[in-house]
């Protein structure tokens, strides 16, 4: 009789729904309707109502939280003459209730609000609640029967999402009653919809705890997807008919049928009646049965029959008498936590007490609120090994060159280039290579500072030594007054030291005020949401200091350019390094031409490191090869004789030089008396003969045998100055010439 009456009421309500194009419906969800979960089923209910009532103005909005909901909804209520607002989530409840209270007695705004909950209904506020503890209990029974390992995992929103663990407990007690040996592990996610946490937590339940059955009360199917990816059967326990999508990969699912409740509620609003409060659960009347169960083909018939029979018992039993309200575990729990029990039966928890279950019951294993562990992304080990091996090989090669410098230090090619400064340059290259090895190594605050120190000091040593030793060549050769110049290595060391001191001071400032340190950075490069990378970072003061260091290096290079330009006229290969320095600068410029645009454009940290290290290797190696290969080549070709006959002669003294000049003068006079043309004595420079503007290589004669050029000019050699340049001390006078009288020069005559 009751069944007949309820059916008639439902038919009367549905038949009295007048299709109306003017009825306006708004539905609020907290997530996309494509979530294959709760929001999708709410949308299915909206579509069912819209079709049944021919509603043309049926809108759906994704919104969450009180403030967002209020800001979205209030203008619509005020301006659009909305008939019904379905606030599907408890997230919407506060805002919907506030707006409903604002217009409860409004003569113009007649909007009805459907909210989740079991509170009091008003003239424009409808309450609906559904009991998913009952369907969780049925799902738990299925999981307990299905598990092979007797290990079940579960994910819940938890108290952080205003959700207690009573429904987790309902699932557990269902599994426990059919399988007393089951172990039950569960996480609280902190939200109904957090795919990242859901995926990670599910993976942990499978990999760490060995669960072979996973269930949840979340809005989407992320947990089920992870289970399927791990070759396990999934359970659809979020209200969406997952088996319709995933087929036999989902062995059990239940679906919410919101149309069965939204339709009569919308019909009541359209007819002007106040629906009041609604309660959804298993129901013996199919028109009001909220849950639709679906089983896989591999589920035994006995299991199906047991669960269907149990769901019918729940449908005909008052909620207070359900098994999850009354059992030996909950009786102990109520005593332990002093929760209210039912007046008629103290071994059963009351409805109010049920919603305060937030601690594990019985042997439930609570794993805590899940937080995703950040994954550290390391620098590519293959790149690290590659740069380290290449740098190590180059260090070995440079050490061999240093040995070669020491071994061939007495050859003109090496001696004329100052062996000690050549080795300084090579040491600078080694320091740079070591800096590159550290640059690609594991990042720490010490590493961040060390790599800048090493690379800058190495560069200062390499370039500074080249510039200083070539500066000496310039001073000696650019000497029109024919003065004997004494410039020893000890006089040049302070200048190299000055280059290093400037570098050290700037780096000390960078270290002290730049706050250069290693930090754990997220959201950079292509890192995932829960990935991080350790990078070096400095503040703006440090960046300014770094620019100053780069400016200092630029100035050092410009000085090198100037010096190389000044010694370009020295036509003895051993002394003239202008081409080598120029080629080195070309290599540096080429790298800068490529690097600067790349560094200005957005780069991933690993790509940036690779570019910088490749550039460092190329610049350093190119500079060393350009400067040193020609020297060793001349050693190989010419040996101890050098490229110029001057190196084959006995070292001369300054007196010998004066004698050569006098002889040159006499030869010039003799040539004039014999009728020859006037012969000019070229006195520019005191090592090489000929005009410095002449790019052709000059021929050197013996000290006491001046020679003539094709144009009749008499060349003057000055082996004494060569001796002074190639020795660390001033050149000695020949013993046989010490007591000789000075030769008169032209001015003395």
Swiss-Prot record:
Residues that span the membrane, as ranges: 386-406, 420-440, 457-477, 493-513, 545-565, 580-600, 610-630
Keyword set includes Membrane: yes
Signal peptide segment: 1-22
BP-aspect Gene Ontology terms: G protein-coupled receptor signaling pathway; response to folic acid
Pfam families: 7tm_3, Bmp
Glycosylation sites: 67, 164, 257, 271, 345
Extracellular compartment residues: 23-385, 441-456, 514-544, 601-609
Subcellular location: Membrane
Stored PROSITE patterns: G_PROTEIN_RECEP_F3_4
Annotated spans, Disordered: 658-749
Compositional bias annotation for Acidic residues: 725-740
Molecular function GO terms recorded: G protein-coupled receptor activity
UniProt topology in membrane: Multi-pass membrane protein
Record keywords, A-Z: G-protein coupled receptor, Glycoprotein, Membrane, Receptor, Signal, Transducer, Transmembrane, Transmembrane helix
Major localization listed first in the record, in broad terms: membrane
Keyword Transmembrane carried by entry: yes
UniProt biased composition (Polar residues): 698-716
An annotated GO cellular component: plasma membrane
Cytoplasmic membrane side: 407-419, 478-492, 566-579, 631-749
Family indicated by similarity: In the N-terminal section; belongs to the BMP lipoprotein family.
Protein name (Swiss-Prot/TrEMBL): Metabotropic glutamate receptor-like protein M
Classification of source organism: Eukaryota, Amoebozoa, Evosea, Eumycetozoa, Dictyostelia
Gene (name only): grlM
